[in-house]
Amino acid sequence: MSPRPSEHLLHLLHTHQRQRHFISDQAIIDIASQLKLPRAQIEAVTEFYSFFSRKPRGKFDILFSNCTSCGDLTLMQELCDKLSIKACETRCDGQVSLTDISCIGMCDHGASALVNDRPLHSLDSKRITQMAALIEADTPLDAWPAEWFEIDDHVQRTDLLLSTPFEAGSALQILAQESIDATLEKIRYADLRGRGGAGFSTAKKWKFCRESEGETRYVICNADEGEPGTFKDRLLLTRHADSVFEGMVICARIINAKQGYIYLRGEYRYLLDSLETALSARRKAGLLGNAIVGLEGFDFDIAIVLGAGAYICGEESALIESLEEKPGIPRIRPPFPVTSGYLGKPTVVNNVETLAAAAAIVLHGGHWFRGAGTWQSRGSKILSISGDCARPGIYEYPFGVTIHDILNDCGAEHTQAVQVGGPSGRLVDASHFEHRIAFEDLATGGSLMIFDDSRDLLQVIRNFTHFFAHESCGFCTPCRVGTMLLKNGMDKVCSGHATAHDLDELKSTAALVSRRSHCGLGITAPNPIRDGLKNFPQLFEQRLLHQKMEPEFDLDAALEEARQIAQRDDAEAHL
């Protein structure tokens, strides 16, 4: 049996963390007793996820984004100085704690942070000073300036999905009027491919799951948008949630699932209440629960489980492990989730954008969708654009748009590189800006980070290697050790202490990590270094230490002391 969200291990840990500011030994004992799980399992889960702490955090728990695109840790240091606290520590009076974390999905708003799970953005020195005063005065967050917490969608360009109105229940009314096979054929004809970056056929995935043995099946929405520089799901879950929900219901109808889950990233906790309210409204309207849209036997419901700050849980099998109340360590595949997923049952895992697109296809038809894009990449792609540009935000384009056109639209100037698909993607130099966003060219889950000529690209690459070393789940040695070696290697390059030999070592380590790692994190972790060496070799050469650094040992000189003791200096006493 799957646990109710209120009884899920992650939910209980979140509750204790918020109430007590840490997970105590007694909390672990109580939770283990309540869930009838081994204490060791509770401890393992607590230690795996960065949002849980075994040591007390502050009443004001502040997490600064260190994202390469928008992070500004000098502001965190300013706040540390004003509050008389060291980074990554809790002040002795328990009032405040500060640390840095990976991207929180606010890259279009500049420097940002989470304060007790609520996002603050557009941070500058003035606001840091104001924050420090409010914290010292013990002012509740609800009494802080409301505009600090207001989030602009920053929708800069719309196309197929975002420009088409979607009314709750509209796709389900059509679903009720056609056969299951006809609905699946719509998805197949539209040639919808997964929007997470891998691009697997959505219709095939649903068909494989539908044909798998077993009566119980599950639908999971992967809303763990953890790739640095990505924030499109934030928009979809706030302004277009009904299309996402209906995509899940449509999938459930096709594969005959009764239960679905939204795995929401911990950094988006502030969206939880609005999503729960929307789900309740759908139940009241007959769009969720029993006999959906009046169809007897069409029963399906959705629950939300909140993640806890583990990037690896964006990988579908790690996400499933997390849903099963375990550390989010990727599984060995095969079997794939469509045959053995959540609780060992056939499971479909799709990301937010894929499900929203599926609902739109059922509503408007396959012709409407496949008319946009390229022959291998149908439809549109929603992009999160950030970094050095005048107009960061959400841009939706038909597949096939060039990097050059995107840079023009967002007001980017003097661009030296674009990171497509987050740190695990491609670092593209100016000579390749005519390449296109498409599965057959530049595939991306939705992140584009722009770097102009004022940026030190080696520091950008270094930050990416630090990100992967921090986010490795530690399961396999090539990734656990290899990402640390890559991090140390880039530290050496950026400090000006690396030699040509060190670069050779960096290349061979990158190849080994990519070839031998257990999951996609390790496989793609070397990408920033490899792309950097390929596209910007001169930057590495300029930082090299051009002197002989090989270890040497003069054996004859080492024997000098022995010769003096023996009072010998003849030819046989020398080498």
Which functions belong to the PLM regions below?
Residues 1-575:
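Feature of Fe-S/electron-transfer and energy-metabolism proteins
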